[in-house]
């Protein structure tokens, strides 16, 4: 006796998408929030205020590379006016990233601050550049 199993490919796709979406939702909304010490948060706030430009990045991140290229090559921000932290090369990089999430609500890198104000990530930086607002925000950096 031969059994013939036939699956609708659309059903398989729907099941895969449902499983993927369930995993994302569970991770985002049901995960335990990470506890960041207030000492670490204060330290990160101090780091943000040390220089006019602060960027938290990771060496392998293409968006981080694009942000650094925009700031330092295209816009010629003096490196002496910036603090760039490569979180993946730091022993406490994940703690710093968690503190940045608590401070700004942004977990991803790059995480950019200019003159102590949270700018966002690479797409936010590029939008400001495209709209002509980034040059205005950076004016104090060049004074």
Curated annotation (Swiss-Prot):
<keyword id="KW-0318">Glutathionylation</keyword>
<feature type="transit peptide" description="Mitochondrion">
    <location>
        <begin position="1"/>
        <end position="30"/>
    </location>
</feature>
<keyword id="KW-0809">Transit peptide</keyword>
<dbReference type="GO" id="GO:0015036">
    <property type="term" value="F:disulfide oxidoreductase activity"/>
</dbReference>
<dbReference type="InterPro" id="IPR002109">
    <property type="entry name" value="Glutaredoxin"/>
</dbReference>
<feature type="modified residue" description="Phosphoserine">
    <location>
        <position position="37"/>
    </location>
</feature>
<keyword id="KW-0249">Electron transport</keyword>
<feature type="disulfide bond" description="Redox-active; alternate">
    <location>
        <begin position="61"/>
        <end position="64"/>
    </location>
</feature>
<dbReference type="InterPro" id="IPR011899">
    <property type="entry name" value="Glutaredoxin_euk/vir"/>
</dbReference>
<protein>
    <recommendedName>
        <fullName>Glutaredoxin-2</fullName>
        <ecNumber>1.11.1.9</ecNumber>
        <ecNumber>2.5.1.18</ecNumber>
    </recommendedName>
</protein>
<keyword id="KW-0813">Transport</keyword>
<dbReference type="InterPro" id="IPR036249">
    <property type="entry name" value="Thioredoxin-like_sf"/>
</dbReference>
<dbReference type="GO" id="GO:0006749">
    <property type="term" value="P:glutathione metabolic process"/>
</dbReference>
<dbReference type="InterPro" id="IPR014025">
    <property type="entry name" value="Glutaredoxin_subgr"/>
</dbReference>
<comment type="similarity">
    <text>Belongs to the glutaredoxin family.</text>
</comment>
<keyword id="KW-0676">Redox-active center</keyword>
<dbReference type="Pfam" id="PF00462">
    <property type="entry name" value="Glutaredoxin"/>
</dbReference>
<dbReference type="GO" id="GO:0005737">
    <property type="term" value="C:cytoplasm"/>
</dbReference>
<feature type="modified residue" description="S-glutathionyl cysteine; alternate">
    <location>
        <position position="61"/>
    </location>
</feature>
<dbReference type="GO" id="GO:0005739">
    <property type="term" value="C:mitochondrion"/>
</dbReference>
<dbReference type="GO" id="GO:0004602">
    <property type="term" value="F:glutathione peroxidase activity"/>
</dbReference>
<feature type="modified residue" description="Phosphoserine">
    <location>
        <position position="91"/>
    </location>
</feature>
<keyword id="KW-1015">Disulfide bond</keyword>
<feature type="binding site">
    <location>
        <position position="109"/>
    </location>
    <ligand>
        <name>glutathione</name>
    </ligand>
</feature>
<keyword id="KW-0496">Mitochondrion</keyword>
<feature type="binding site">
    <location>
        <begin position="58"/>
        <end position="63"/>
    </location>
    <ligand>
        <name>glutathione</name>
    </ligand>
</feature>
<dbReference type="GO" id="GO:0034599">
    <property type="term" value="P:cellular response to oxidative stress"/>
</dbReference>
<keyword id="KW-0560">Oxidoreductase</keyword>
<comment type="function">
    <text>Component of the glutathione system which performs several activities such as glutathione-dependent oxidoreductase, glutathione peroxidase and glutathione S-transferase (GST) activity. The disulfide bond functions as an electron carrier in the glutathione-dependent synthesis of deoxyribonucleotides by the enzyme ribonucleotide reductase. In addition, it is also involved in reducing cytosolic protein- and non-protein-disulfides in a coupled system with glutathione reductase.</text>
</comment>
<keyword id="KW-0808">Transferase</keyword>
<dbReference type="GO" id="GO:0005829">
    <property type="term" value="C:cytosol"/>
</dbReference>
<dbReference type="GO" id="GO:0015038">
    <property type="term" value="F:glutathione disulfide oxidoreductase activity"/>
</dbReference>
<feature type="binding site">
    <location>
        <begin position="122"/>
        <end position="123"/>
    </location>
    <ligand>
        <name>glutathione</name>
    </ligand>
</feature>
<dbReference type="GO" id="GO:0004364">
    <property type="term" value="F:glutathione transferase activity"/>
</dbReference>
<keyword id="KW-0597">Phosphoprotein</keyword>
<keyword id="KW-0963">Cytoplasm</keyword>
<feature type="domain" description="Glutaredoxin">
    <location>
        <begin position="41"/>
        <end position="143"/>
    </location>
</feature>
<dbReference type="GO" id="GO:0005634">
    <property type="term" value="C:nucleus"/>
</dbReference>
<dbReference type="InterPro" id="IPR011767">
    <property type="entry name" value="GLR_AS"/>
</dbReference>
